[in-house]
């Protein structure tokens, strides 16, 4: 009996403590629904369609509101004005990376995506500079993407026009582009080492994006004590880390500081230059984690966008016909598309932008955090508070994009048929934490899609009206439903 009383008292104290901690901060933070003890507002959120839940809350509490995902407050920014004010106008104050316990457990704050403070600044600066040195925005990386696009075309020809699921083959191309930047060499699509590498990367991205991981991130104690797919992430990451450290070792043995070949070489040279500095951020641990970030952010997201783009082109054959007419007129059939062509292909450029806007791949992006105590609008947000931005609310803003739920390249064309930029276009997020590989991803999407459409007619297995383009929401990303198509050589 004494044990029962003790447990009851303990539980009551925990609940009262939770209620006190939540109520003590609510006078300063933006408004929001009343949280339950311990679990917060978790039961009020649809983990498979978080962005819709945010839209519903914004109607009740305005564009800046607070949710408790577990016992900690999270500030939500909904709509273009709130997102712009935070991430662009006050970018430095919102440049922290918000809480992501599962990533913190396996990556331990290394790399560029989940790091903070000086480490993040150093790794991001180095990554951007190295991508430029390797030819980002120049011919060097463009040549690699063009080569990969042609290899992809050859693989698609092997299907001989028969029905196929494009998931695997569209994953190979972006992964190989990253491999060529990191290791200097690409792999054959059937190479065993390449297949294992791709499988581990893709599996980790899928698990990290799953609803179960959103639960684990809200209740970190589950990570160590509950069975589940999250344990597979640790095993996969350890495999990838071991693989990358072996590659780094090979690079060390053949390094020529006067002639860097790839990302690893540039990092090792930088490491030599700063090895006299105490607490230098350029450790092998940081290198392995940064490479892992480049693979994770640069393969699955691009391949999913490509896969969704082909589905939309099947659904809207009139759009496909206009794009292919533009390719025939500007590029022809006797050379590969190049980035210089894009400025002469406004409809194709608009189509690719519309794909990214429409699919809304990462509805809430990765969490931010405020780097100091700040006053935002009329609210006080304490240092370290996690901030989530609803990119969906920006990309699907009906004032900027009339009929936002419709796929229409006209959203990015003016009355003269010329390409029209939009400040609301932020599929890569915006501000200080905008995706470091944005330029590479845009290049891949343009060159790979135009090369495919230059060489093939896309044939659906069903009538376009029967094609389902409804996204499969998995909690973090919007994925296309499974489908098959035929690539008919032109």
From Swiss-Prot:
GO terms for cellular component: endoplasmic reticulum membrane. The keyword GTP-binding does not apply. Pfam families: p450. The keyword Kinase does not apply. Its cofactor is heme. It is an enzyme of class 1 (oxidoreductase). The modification N6-acetyllysine is found at residues 249, 252, 375. Residues 1-25 form the signal peptide. Pathway: Lipid metabolism; arachidonate metabolism. Heme binds at residue 435. It is a peripheral membrane protein. GO terms for molecular function: arachidonate 14,15-epoxygenase activity; heme binding; iron ion binding; oxidoreductase activity, acting on paired donors, with incorporation or reduction of molecular oxygen, reduced flavin or flavoprotein as one donor, and incorporation of one atom of oxygen. A cytochrome P450 monooxygenase that selectively catalyzes the epoxidation of 14,15 double bond of (5Z,8Z,11Z,14Z)-eicosatetraenoic acid (arachidonate) forming 14,15-epoxyeicosatrienoic acid (14,15-EET) regioisomer. Mechanistically, uses molecular oxygen inserting one oxygen atom into a substrate, and reducing the second into a water molecule, with two electrons provided by NADPH via cytochrome P450 reductase (CPR; NADPH--hemoprotein reductase). Belongs to the cytochrome P450 family. This is Cytochrome P450 2C29. It comes from Mus musculus. The gene is Cyp2c29.
